[in-house]
Amino acid sequence: MGTLDIDFVRAQFPAFSEPSLQGQAFFENAGGSYTCKPVLDRLTRYYTQRKVQPYGPYDASRLAGEEMDEARARMAAILGVNTDELSFGPSTTQNTYVLAQAFRQWMQPGDAIVVTNQDHEANSGPWRRLVEDGFEIREWQIDPETGSLNLQDLENLLDEKVRLVCFPHCSNVIGEINPVTEITAIAHAAGAFVCVDGVSYAPHGFPNVGDLGPDIYLFSAYKTYGPHQGCMVIRRALGELLPNQAHYFNADALYKRFTPAGPDHAQIAASAGMADYVDLLCYHHNGPKGNATERGAFVHDLMRGQEVALLQPVLDAIKDRNAVRLIGTSDATRRAPTVALSLSRNAEAVATDLVEHGIMAGGGDFYAVRPLQAMGVDLDHGVLRVSFTHYTSQQEIDQLLGALDAVL
């Protein structure tokens, strides 16, 4: 595995050459990444050349449909799943609400779902609301000091009543990467399906969902350098078991069964630009010329290697500061570069102070109220969150550390 060519990477993102953004280092990537040029090019082309109803007989319509199909096929291949096991919806939260409705119709009285208090609300609230329909909700709780999930605690929650286990690949404030394959195996052994929220993990390298093994995997394309779409993998066995949520005449198309809303044609088509970007990085760094899953895995490891190298010095500089509590582990190899800090004063005010030092970051609860409460964080203060990705430069890291020295 070689070293990431950071200049090549940043050249793929027009934001880095945008005059209005010069001098500002972007550290709110967990809220939405910059968009890569292949996605912008495809979106512009669609809106200028293909803005018609797709799948018709005339050229513009035919090409529109082909580009939508291309996006699904290429992204599914990177994720290691079948093409029709990937659906696009308006957002991850919306996709989860649709799934919860399907489970509500499928489950029987007395059935149970396991949720965590480590999740973003998108993979928590929709499931918890099913208690109103008579289903049992069991909470897999984090350690209040570390924020970690203990596998034995999960095993203690499982029995023949549990139909679904929901958890994050990593939390959007705690950052620790959960062992998806191991957790999935435990849940499957107990007869439960598995739903993984990958929103905070996928920006750091698309996972091989097929190898990981969950029945549902969710992430948001606008955080993975793409357009504003929620990407949802539902493996065939579960997708064909759950009741259809779309128009009745679309029930036979697996990728349509859980997307009742009309598809956003242009943004789905533009999602193929994420696959273009993966291929650009793979080929530029002399990666494998094999199938898309192999190329995706190569780029995943390339991204993670870069991020870990940049993240560890940040964690080292923060972890022993007075009046600063690092949320989650200080080991960069075990977490995503999404770093939340509990401070002695209001985090939004600190984020405002950072603007004066050219740092774009955020403060608040980031829809992760449950994990912050469980860890004893004062919600009136919230947390300061600094988050980055593989395209962040060493110069920007230095700028961040200098700014934190000045404001903390």
Summary of predicted features, one role per range:
Residues M1-L408:
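Pyridoxal 5′-phosphate
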